[in-house]
Amino acid sequence: MKHIPSNVFIGIDVSKDRLDVAVAPSGESMGFTNSEDGIVLLADFIKPRDPALVLFEATGGWEMNAVRHLAAQRLPLVVLNPRQVRDFAKATG
């Protein structure tokens, strides 16, 4: 059976201590600690939503443990350059 693509997109704002998650189009949001346990909970939150894409803004390496864990879960990931994100936001108003 062919997989039907999801229309769910998940953005993750990363800091040293936190992973703040926003889900589109549902508008859900959730926060997790940026720790081994928090990353496991993050994956448990994301997987049932079957996202088309999970997006991280590169944050000086603080995102890498979460990226590695979610990649091992075979989730579709993109790590974005913060400058490109900022330039895109400016361009779209």
Model-derived features: positions:
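Phosphate- and other anionic-substrate recognition elements at nucleic-acid/protein interfaces
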Residues: 1-93
